[in-house]
Amino acid sequence: KLTASEVFVFAQINSEHCRHKIFGGTFIIDGVEQESSLFQMIKKTTQENPNKIISAYKDNVAFAEGPVVEQFAPADHSKPDFFQVRDIQSVISLKAETHNFPTTVEPFNGASTGTGGEIRDRMGGGKGSWPIAGTAVYMTSYPRTDEGRPWEEILPVRQWLYQTPEQILIKASNGASDFGNKFGQPLICGSVLTFEHKENDEVYGYDKVIMLAGGVGYGTKRDCLKGAPEAGNKVVVIGGDNYRIGLGGGSVSSVDTGRYSSGIELNAVQRANAEMQKRAYNVVRALCEEETNPVVSIHDHGSAGHVNCLSELVEECGGLIDMSKLPVGDQTLSAKEIIANESQERMGLLIEEEAIEHVRKVAERERAPMYVVGETTGDHRFAFQQADGVRPFDLAVEQMFGSSPKTYMIDKTVERHYEMPKYEQSKLHEYLTNVLQLEAVACKDWLTNKVCLLYTSPSPRD
C-alpha cells in the first residue's frame, strides 16, 4: 500500500512539468500518426547540425564548445590562499525555460523564482558551471494602461484570475530584475509581447501569461558531463531550510490555471531568496575552479523539491536519505511536505566521501548551509527514512523513472480563414502612431533591463 508521501510525490515527478508526456507523446492528426513528437522535432536540429554542441537535452543546460580562457582564482578555496592563473578549455552554457503558472498567480515571486531557477540550472550543468547573464521575455494580454487605444477595446475586460496584465508586466519584470540585482547577474536583453484578437467568434489572448527566463554561462570542458554515482557517495544539500512553500508546483503547473482552488494554487508558488542562492553558487563556483572537482553530479532543487532533485542524483544506483539531517525551518511540516516542498535556492550534490570535509570548509567560508543528508546505496531503491526508522517514502528507482504510459494526442486539422486588414492611406500617420504604442514594438529595455550591469562589469553586452 502506497503512503500519502508516495502518492503525492508520484503526482509531482510524473507531471507534464517533469516528464513531458505530452511534449514527447504521439500525435495522430486526421487519422495519421505523425512521424515525430514535438520533443523529437526540437532535438532534430541538433542531430542534423551538431556543430560544436557537446551536450543537449540530457542535462540542466546545453553545452557548446568554447574557447580556451584564462582563469584567475585561488588555488584552494577552503582557506586563504594565493591566486593562480591557468588556462582552461571552456564550454558555453545555454538555457531557457518558462515559469508561466507562478507568474500568472503571483507575478513578482513567480518571475523572480523563474529567473532564479534558470540560474540554478546553469549552476547545475555537468559537475557545476557558472552563470554570466540572463534574459527575460513576457507575454500577456493587452495591459490597458491608457485610454484612447482602440485595439485594446475590441475585447471587453475579463475577470482576471489573479492579476491584471498591467500588474503582471510591472510586477513580473520587477521580480526578475530584483533577483538578478540581488544575486549579481545582469539581465542584458529580453522582449515583451501583448496580444488579443477576436475573429469568427474565436478569441485569442495571453490571459495565462508567458514568462520565459533564459541565460548564458560557461564551465570547464572537464566538468561538462555528470559522473556516474557509485555506492558510498555522499548526498549533500547546500542552501536553505524546508518550509511550507511550493507544494504541488509540478502537478499544478501542468494543468489549466484556475482548475484548482486559489489556496492550492497560491501555495504552489515558490518564494525567492537570492542571497541564499548566491551563497550556494559561491560553493559550486569554488569547487569548479579548483584543480580537482570532488563533485560527482549536481542538480538544483526545483519542482517536487528534495524527492525530484535527489532521486535524479542517485537514479543509476539508488540512495537512502536521512530525514533527520534535512534542515526544517517549520516544525509543523508533515513528512510529505518535507520531502516535496519547493523551498528554493538549494542545490543537491553527490560528493566523494573523502572530499566531504574539504567541501564543508568551503561552505563555511561562503556562509552557505551544508548538510550531508544521505548516501548512494547500490540497491536501486530510493527512500527517505525518519529517525524512528519509518520510511514515508520507499520505492524502486524503476517505479519512479520507468517508462510512463504512452500519451496519444488525437486531433484533426481545423481550417481557419482570416480577413486581410483594411487600410486607408489617409490614416497612415494614425496607424504609425498606434503601432509605435504597442509594447511589442521598438526597444524593450524599459521593461527588461532593470538589473544593474555593474554587478559583472563589463557585462557580456558591453
Q: What label would you give each PLM region?
A:
Residues 1-457, 461:
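Glycine/proline-enriched, intrinsically flexible loops and inter-domain linkers
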